UniProtKB/Swiss-Prot annotation:
The keyword Transferase does not apply. The keyword Cytoplasm does not apply. One of its GO terms (biological process) is transcriptional attenuation by ribosome. It comes from the Bacteria. Belongs to the thr operon leader peptide family. This protein is involved in control of the biosynthesis of threonine. It comes from Escherichia coli O157:H7. This is thr operon leader peptide. Keywords: Amino-acid biosynthesis, Leader peptide, Threonine biosynthesis. HAMAP family: Leader_Thr (MF_01907).
Amino acid sequence: MKRISTTITTTITTTITITITTGNGAG
């Protein structure tokens, strides 16, 4: 359960980072 939660958190963090990077690159 803890491992799954960590994976989800990592995925969300990565997605947010990519979104911010893409936004800055486009903007």
